[in-house]
């Protein structure tokens, strides 16, 4: 395999970020479609607090937020920011609890093999196959136009770089896995 999905992992082990003061217009700012974003005011987010539970889930350095985007703690931004910023924007979120950032991938690579991918009866792709000759060879984090709203991909060199940074910084919550298996 030459392409993996980059995502927040362990949603049952760490508290996710949620949109605070939900407003459809503000929440729509978090839709990740591969296009650059310019926020007049950052969307407000907060960590989910389970009101019925005395023991809260710990906070990850890369908490779950929305599909196709990554939320980063200050620690994750400091560790991964230089690498990730080559492939998109790192935007500040208005987080009530602690500094948080939104990684918006704007690097688009059309490399999905639509014919070889596994599809639902309606034609939507559930398990991706890739055209190896279109996948970048240099370290890369990217989106394919067909799955831009729901997936972030990374190639072998990018996977190796991210895994090294995550291990060196001791980051939690980031997962590099097979596409379509989360």
Feature locations, PLM:
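A glycine-rich, hydrophobic loop/mini-helix early in the fold
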Residues: 37-65, 69
């Amino acid at each position: 395999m030459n392409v993996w999905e980059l995502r927040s992992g362990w949603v049952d082990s760490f508290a996710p970020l949620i949109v605070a003061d939900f407003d459809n217009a503000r929440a729509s700012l978090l839709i990740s479609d591969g296009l650059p974003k310019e926020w007049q005011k950052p969307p407000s987010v907060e960590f989910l607090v389970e009101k019925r539970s005395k023991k809260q889930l710990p906070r990850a350095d890369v908490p779950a937020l929305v599909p196709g985007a990554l939320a980063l703690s200050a620690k994750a931004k400091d560790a991964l920011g230089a690498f990730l910023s080559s492939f998109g924007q790192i935007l500040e979120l208005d987080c009530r609890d602690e500094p948080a950032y939104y990684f918006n991938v704007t690097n688009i690579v059309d490399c999905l093999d639509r014919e070889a991918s596994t599809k639902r009866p309606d034609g939507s792709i559930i398990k991706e196959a890739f055209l190896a000759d279109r996948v970048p060879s240099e370290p890369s984090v990217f989106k394919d136009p067909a799955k831009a709203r729901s997936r972030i991909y990374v190639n072998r060199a990018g996977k190796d770089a991210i895994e090294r940074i995550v291990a060196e910084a001791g980051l939690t919550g980031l997962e590099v896995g097979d596409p379509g298996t989360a």
